[in-house]
Design a protein with these regions (language model features):
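Conserved SAM-binding loop of SAM-dependent methyltransferases across substrates and taxa
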Residues: 75-88
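Class I SAM-dependent transferase core
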Residues: 1-64, 69, 99-102, 106-116
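Conserved S-adenosyl-L-methionine
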Residues: 70-74
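Hydrophobic packing within well-folded, soluble alpha/beta domains
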Residues: 68-69, 82, 91
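S-adenosylmethionine
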Residues: 88-92, 96-145
């Protein structure tokens, strides 16, 4: 339930709360079409995907205009929840699978997120430098570095 997000992040603005609340229905729509998130795991959407993505924010606050790349974003995790949480931080979400980026672009458009760009590309072909690299279940640290 979205209330779990609100419990762990009580200082969210009303706009952020609305966006986090909307996430479930947007992903439910897409999950019925192309299985963005494991169907068995979807019932745990807010805890296993949204809160898990946001957990870094309990330890690290990103300053305005920081540039972050989310590698292997899949359905947009952790990038989309973090972009909602940090609206003045610039996120680039990449994935080699174009259908995943298609879904991510629809989520971004539906939530009117202006601080995210997307690319269908593998990390080794990215030329731009970023302040931080984030990912979930993509590769071991040695491979990413």
């Amino acid at each position: 339930m979205v209330q779990e997000v609100f419990k762990y992040f009580p200082n969210l603005t009303e706009i952020q709360r609305e966006k986090f609340t909307s996430l479930y229905d947007i992903y439910a729509f897409w999950n019925n079409k192309i299985n963005v998130i494991s169907r068995n795991d979807f019932k745990n959407f807010y805890v296993r995907h949204v809160l898990h993505s946001m957990s870094i924010a309990k330890f690290k606050h990103f300053s305005n205009d920081t540039n972050i790349i989310d590698v292997g974003t899949g359905g947009g995790f952790p990038g989309i929840p973090l972009a909602i949480l940090f609206p003045h931080v610039n996120f680039t979400l990449i994935d080699s699978k174009k259908k995943k980026i298609f879904v991510v672009n629809d989520v971004i458009k539906s939530l009117n997120l202006k601080n995210i760009t997307t690319k269908s590309i593998r990390l080794e072909f990215v030329k731009k430098k970023y302040d931080y690299l984030i990912c979930r279940s993509v590769a071991d640290t040695k491979t990413l570095l």
